[in-house]
């Protein structure tokens, strides 16, 4: 299978039938041996954040994705065999039905893997699935071949064959609309007639005598109960459609045994249920349209208000067709409905009565809404609030921590060494990826280490002694902005510094206890600003500029290649899982952790604690299982 063709421009796989507890870290550990992975995403419900039981994995190389598809399909994760197929981003290809085969009358023992193994001999399979419910297989499935020719070969060979001693039907997949059109054409040519309401005094012989007058009857059957008595309905099958149609036209509504019988086309149970459902929905929609804009919902009613009092209060605003106070056990539930004859009258009643005090309680009056409408409105409001909360900037982390002593030296030193400040200039919550393209406010600075060029020291008498005079934080916001601008941003390009600005910019030293900031006279000028780099043995230095310049799909891979060896030294057996968990963190924070071993070690220990707690929970469940049996 050519994964690099026009059908599959990306090396992306769809992973289906996942256990709800499967996470990205588990999938990373499972699929990373196949090759470098750019991204993994488990799709979740937008409201509940529960897994939808499928995921997407993007490999760097199509060959790695194809290897995973060939070798890992139907492997078991958390007790469930997974189903892997190419991610088809074109919905037209998925919905066209070209190469899609339908199989029915399958034995219950046939699962996805058995069906795949049976039909893979006819060509490349894009998707294979046996439809199941909570009780197991439903006896049918689908196989989607890459080409129409492969599907034809499978149909010609397998249709009517025995699979596990059951004769299966194999044919081209047809959409519901196509099936309904075909079935509708067959229905118009019916030969089987259904008769009901003829009572208990009827048998096959007498029913044949009555209906044989309209044509040749192939079979006649009166349905009986366990005692041998008629259940009041039966079937008559004619040789052709014209005879059956004549029997329906002549006998429907006639009297037999003193009863008016019903005669019509025989229907399958699912067809009858669909027709009844369609009629019910039609009646429901007519009722909704009839009361649209004229039915009012009234709540906060006093317990003493009944139907007559409710009608009396709203009568001045128009003709009322119905007024009802909802009760339970003879007691008012505090709300009711008033229906007017026209929308104009209902609108006037809402305007006049909403908020009016009736029997010491203010009424709430509004147009009545169906439960589905209210649920949709509430869901929409909730999602809007959720989106607003996500779009709002988060609170600053560590905003109550006083920074350590920052100062820029005035001593001449060579520009070939880099010094890193012990704390970031502006510790903030790392921005999520979905907000990475939004403009930042002017006062925002990414969490980047403050650095300066380090030169050979010599004594300088112009550095004054700092006093711990007060615990009040000095007002140095303007200078903090300048100092922060000297550092390089982790998500931006290499910082550009204007030499003239560097010469005129005053240098300060800070202390948590001083009220005023003392300027330091610099005898030399900073010639350049060095960018922090993460050095790993055998790999090129990783800087913020280098990371930002890489394509988004490669940034996680670059960080993972540098994080994994460090984690492997601390926890060799859990390195894969922990790496996958940490790669979900924002890139800027990952880069900061690589620069700060203490931060990385802390995050690793947190991940280990989470994994150990999860493992302990699973062990407890396993140990408790035998006692439940």
From Swiss-Prot:
One example of the protein's molecular function in GO is: mRNA 3'-UTR binding
What residue stretches are annotated with the PABC domain?
539-616
Q: What is its main location?
A: cytoplasm
- RRM domain boundaries: 11-89, 99-175, 191-268, 294-370
Q: Name one GO cellular component term.
A: cytoplasmic stress granule
Output the GO biological process annotations, alphabetical, semicolon-separated: chordate embryonic development; mRNA processing; mRNA stabilization; negative regulation of nuclear-transcribed mRNA poly(A) tail shortening; translation
PROSITE patterns, alphabetically? PABC, RRM
Localization per Swiss-Prot or TrEMBL: Cytoplasm
Give tissue specificity per the record.
Expressed in adult testis, but at a reduced level compared to oocytes.
Identify the InterPro entries for this entry.
Nucleotide-bd_a/b_plait_sf, PABP-dom, PABP_1234, PABP_HYD_C, PABP_RRM1, RBD_domain_sf, RRM2_I_PABPs, RRM_dom
UniProt cross-references to SUPFAM superfamilies, sorted A to Z: PABC (PABP) domain, RNA-binding domain, RBD
Asked whether the keyword RNA-binding is assigned, the reply is: yes
Q: Which UniProt keywords apply?
A: Cytoplasm, mRNA processing, Protein biosynthesis, Repeat, RNA-binding
Function, please?
A: Binds and protects the poly(A) tail of mRNA with or without an AU-rich element (ARE) and prevents mRNA deadenylation. Stimulates the translation of mRNAs to which it is bound during early development.
Tell me its family. Belongs to the polyadenylate-binding protein type-1 family.
The protein's name is Embryonic polyadenylate-binding protein A
Q: Which organism is it from?
A: Xenopus laevis (African clawed frog)
